[in-house]
């Protein structure tokens, strides 16, 4: 499949292409969806490990005394009780409970010991 040259490329694009990644247009990004067969890749992940290039995803930082309260209103999972370095899967929903996006939220401290959350969004 020939992809438009105008597609965004992650820092790992050349590696994916050189290693046989079948590249597709994913929301304006050239990303691999498959390398070998679906069954081979499924078995590899189930029996060993797998990684994904998520460098195209957005990262939002939330800090300050109201960060946990704000995220409690935005997300379907609690964040106030997270341990340092912990990551949780959560959802952002609309007023009717429909899913807008699935996200990862992490809890960290900066070099001065100040806490902050990082939200990784699609």
Question: Where in this protein do the model-derived segments appear?
Answer:
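Basic, glycine/lysine-rich polyanion-binding surfaces/domains
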Residues: 1-122
């Amino acid at each position: 499949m020939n992809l438009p040259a105008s597609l965004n490329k992650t820092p790992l694009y050349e590696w994916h292409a050189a290693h046989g990644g079948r590249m597709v247009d994913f929301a304006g990004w050239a990303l691999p969806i498959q390398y070998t067969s679906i069954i081979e890749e499924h078995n590899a992940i189930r029996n060993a490990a797998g990684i994904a290039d998520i460098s195209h995803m957005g990262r939002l930082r939330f800090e300050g005394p109201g960060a946990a309260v704000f995220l409690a209103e935005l997300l379907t999972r609690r964040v106030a009780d997270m341990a340092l370095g912990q990551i949780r899967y959560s959802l952002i929903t609309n007023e009717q409970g429909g899913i807008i996006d699935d996200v990862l939220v992490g809890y960290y401290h900066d070099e001065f010991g100040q806490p902050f959350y990082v939200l990784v969004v699609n």
